[in-house]
Amino acid sequence: MTASFKAVMIGGVRWYQQRISANTPPCCKYYPTCSNYAIEALERYGAFKGGVLAVLRLLRCRPWSRGGIDDVPQRYSIFYRFSWSKAHEEPRLTPLATTQREAQR
């Protein structure tokens, strides 16, 4: 049940990317974009936990936010951006995928 719900949620995000987002100019302040973040969070943590992270990301994406690189956390925590959290991760200057590729060289 959870896997099928996850697939439905990912399908909804992909539908948004193809039908709505494709017809508007790029305006996301974050990398990866909010929709790509949602897909990665859903794939990594499932429908419920990934959905929670996606909603929290959408709440952070507002006109007065700084934006920047905001990868899906390596360990699940809704508090990963707070310094007092055990799962705290500092925002990166380079995307995580780039950092991992350079480490493999």
Curated annotation (Swiss-Prot):
Subcellular location per UniProt equals: Cell membrane
Q: What's one GO-annotated cellular component?
A: plasma membrane
Main location, first listed in the record: membrane
Annotated membrane topology is: Peripheral membrane protein
Q: Which domain of life is it from?
A: Bacteria
**Entry's SMART domains?**
Haemolytic
Keywords of the record: Cell membrane, Membrane
Q: What does this protein do?
A: Could be involved in insertion of integral membrane proteins into the membrane.
**Which family is this sequence assigned to?**
Belongs to the UPF0161 family.
Alphabetized NCBIfam families for the sequence: membrane protein insertion efficiency factor YidD
**Protein name as catalogued:** Putative membrane protein insertion efficiency factor
Q: Which organism is it from?
A: Bifidobacterium longum subsp. infantis (strain ATCC 15697 / DSM 20088 / JCM 1222 / NCTC 11817 / S12)
